[in-house]
């Protein structure tokens, strides 16, 4: 196990550089990539709080050098070997500690319990009938150093969206933009007839910083010309996806915020396939049918007859406090 950019009080200027990539590679030829974190309310059917998310499964039976799986393997090795990645622990004697032995036993017992309860769902799968052949898959990433980054992913996404002929549809859990990002959206809105974004409503957002910033800047976002749909599904939506026309799909870890743009490592897949685009649209629309369109006068267009989540007094107070006490640091959220 290695740690990317371990926190060090002697180098506080590096502490904001985080690894935000989420992917899993199996056998050097198949992988899952998306926006899902690896704790309970992102995985499985655990009780309590949940987050809805999205990943893409890529199967490469005979990966060639230029395939995306090899690009991803190279990316992993680059981060693994870079100077800001260090061993979590590298002392073999730690295995003799009681606490470590206890943790090992808990993992073994937990795995056995999981296997016994779910063995009916664990089997080899032929994905031929469940996947689509693609024309091309491109992996796009931010720089991997821990300092402020050039907005590589944002720039490439912007160029792709500006080239759209008919539509761009974005899903993101948070919107925390600066003027450069707003300007990009204005350019897209001027050239693309159907340009929309879905994000969590203020009441439905699991991130208090995202709620506070969106509540303050909603009209500024609308002034770019983009249509905003607010998700009201009860559980916070964490998916990050983009549809461009009817043949390009984007799935990954990138949020529409300044942290993803300038601070974090990020990975997205750009997939050229009409079948994938259609499948992704169907999945995205399941959530949009539980959303309302925000209008500039503060009212809503509600074609799906959605009951909004109640904005509680506690949430209103939290939004107010974040806006007035921490708004100056919005680029860090």
Segments predicted by a language model, with ranges:
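Charged, low-complexity intrinsically disordered terminal segments
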Residues: 1-21, 26-333
């Amino acid at each position: 196990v290695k740690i990317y950019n371990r926190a060090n009080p002697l180098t506080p200027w590096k502490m904001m550089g985080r690894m935000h990539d989420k992917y899993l590679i199996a056998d050097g030829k198949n992988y899952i990539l998306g926006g899902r974190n690896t704790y309970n309310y992102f995985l499985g059917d655990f009780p309590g709080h949940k987050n809805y998310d999205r990943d893409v499964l890529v199967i490469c039976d005979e990966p060639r050098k230029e395939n995306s799986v090899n690009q991803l393997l190279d990316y992993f090795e680059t981060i693994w070997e870079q100077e800001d990645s260090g061993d979590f622990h590298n002392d073999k004697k730690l295995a003799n500690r009681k606490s470590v032995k206890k943790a090992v036993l808990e993992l073994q017992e937990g795995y056995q319990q999981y296997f016994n309860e779910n063995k009916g769902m664990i089997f080899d799968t032929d994905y031929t009938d469940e996947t689509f052949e693609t024309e091309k898959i491109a992996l796009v990433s931010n720089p991997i150093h821990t300092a402020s980054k050039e907005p590589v992913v944002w720039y490439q996404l912007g160029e792709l969206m500006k080239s759209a002929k008919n539509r761009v549809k974005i899903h993101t859990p948070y919107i925390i933009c600066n003027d450069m990002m707003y300007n990009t959206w204005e350019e897209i809105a001027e050239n693309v007839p159907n340009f929309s974004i879905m994000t969590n409503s203020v009441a439905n957002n699991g991130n208090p910083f995202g709620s506070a910033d969106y509540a303050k800047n909603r009209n500024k976002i609308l002034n770019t010309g983009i249509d905003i749909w607010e998700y009201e599904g009860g559980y916070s939506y964490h998916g990050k996806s983009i549809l461009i026309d009817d043949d390009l799909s984007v799935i990954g870890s990138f949020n529409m915020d300044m942290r993803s743009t300038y601070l974090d490592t990020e990975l997205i897949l750009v997939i050229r396939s009409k079948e994938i685009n259609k499948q992704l649209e169907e999945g995205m629309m399941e959530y949009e049918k539980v959303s309302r369109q925000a209008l500039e006068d503060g009212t809503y267009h509600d074609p799906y007859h959605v009951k909004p989540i109640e904005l509680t007094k506690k949430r209103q107070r939290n939004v107010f406090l974040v806006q007035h006490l921490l708004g100056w640091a919005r680029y860090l959220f």
